[in-house]
């Protein structure tokens, strides 16, 4: 089977999983993607397919195909990268794939749990991504800090790096707020000074407080204090 035949076959399989109602709903959540490029596949179903497809030789061929035509093809690509257990190979495939991400959902789909075993060296790549000129690469870098470096891997320099980012991009700043809201739930005393000393732009500062107040992981006492830290525009 050549590459063109493989893509046709994969695409046929993807359309067999289509849910048009879900497509119409999901299209409203990812306005940066044209609706015509969304097939409409629920994530658990796509994950199951990716797990099966990842065991075949065709998956290696699929990873060589970039850019993709459909949103779900990009998501499938990301889910296949997640299955790679070799650090260098995984990083290499990420480098090829990240510039093609064009929406927050594909960006946030990638968890890369295997990177927990490589925290000491993976942080260097995260720093580099956060200095990118591409919004979704920056967002991805922040998401990796949030997923893998807020518990035993936490260092004070990490929130400093996120706070220092200056961007006009909504999807970058929303991830920054999400990072700090999650960090407050896990490292409250170490993160609180970023709000008390107003180390971020006003929008991200206030959005962090909003998301924290909405969180069940923040105590009522903490929420009451956070409310006093809102910046009035």
Please tell me what each predicted stretch does.
Residues 1-233:
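Alpha-helical scaffold domains
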């Amino acid at each position: 089977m050549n590459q063109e035949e493989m893509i046709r076959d994969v695409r046929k399989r993807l359309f067999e999983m289509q849910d048009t109602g879900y497509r119409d709903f999901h299209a409203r959540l990812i306005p940066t993607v044209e609706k015509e490029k969304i097939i409409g596949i629920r994530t658990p179903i796509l994950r199951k397919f990716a797990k099966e497809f990842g065991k075949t030789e065709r998956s290696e061929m699929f990873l060589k195909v970039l850019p993709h035509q459909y949103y779900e093809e990009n998501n499938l690509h990301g889910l296949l990268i997640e299955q790679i257990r070799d650090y260098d190979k995984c990083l290499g495939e990420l480098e090829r794939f990240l510039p093609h991400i064009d929406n927050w959902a594909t960006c946030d789909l990638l968890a890369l749990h295997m990177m927990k075993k490589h925290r000491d060296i993976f942080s260097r790549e995260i720093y580099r991504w956060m200095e990118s000129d591409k919004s979704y690469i920056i967002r991805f870098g922040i998401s990796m800090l949030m997923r893998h470096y807020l518990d035993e891997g936490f260092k004070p320099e990490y929130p400093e790096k996120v706070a220092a980012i200056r961007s006009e991009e909504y999807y970058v700043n929303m991830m920054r707020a999400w990072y700090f809201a999650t960090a407050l739930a896990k490292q409250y005393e170490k993160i609180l000074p970023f709000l008390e000393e107003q180390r971020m732009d006003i929008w991200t500062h206030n959005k962090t407080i909003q998301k924290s107040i909405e969180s069940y992981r923040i105590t009522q006492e903490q929420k009451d204090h956070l409310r006093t830290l809102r910046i009035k525009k």
